[in-house]
Amino acid sequence: ANKESLVVGGEYVMRLAAEKRAPILPIDSEHSAIFQCLVGEQSPIRRLIITCSGGAFRDLPCEKLADVTVEQALRHPQWEMGAKITIDSSTLVNKGFEVIEAHWLFGTPVEKITVLLHPQSIVHSMVEFEDGAIKAQLGTPDMRMPISFALMYPRRATRPGERFDFMAHPQLTFAGVDRAKYPALEIACECLRRRGTAACTMNGANEVAVA
């Protein structure tokens, strides 16, 4: 239920899970989406596509980032979350950690993991296959859905309440991530390439920086 375990010790967690034949079911909405897209698939994938809202400063020019406040960083445009993860979302540190998490959960090299800005947070993630087909998992930004999926898998819970309305979301947009504006994303990818304790060091540095 936390990504840091896989960020700092993914190699050991996944090795132990394999030895004990213990499946790991993701709860993060992005990784739950990928998992759901992979259920029943036997063919290798071309890439994983992880989406992100862009956080509180998505529409803010780079030159104005030096003047932002903590209060501004805590205003996430889509999700209601704790303070630490909301700050990490504003810097895309959280998304970088999710790339590391996806690498360990699905055995996908960093070169085959793409991050796209998706302001509406409706498409939670996608999987592209070698034949060009892309599967996506869509839904409102509500953590109850990935949590219930993990708890009930392989069945699905019956959830009362309002259903997703496509007419209320007529436009879904996507864009590439500005790596200069969000350097933490590339740092996380580089940690994966370096292996060893690099990701653990990044996590520790971020814990101190955000505290």
Please annotate each region the language model reported.
Residues 1-211:
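Catalytic, metal-anchored helix/loop core of enzyme active sites in primary metabolism
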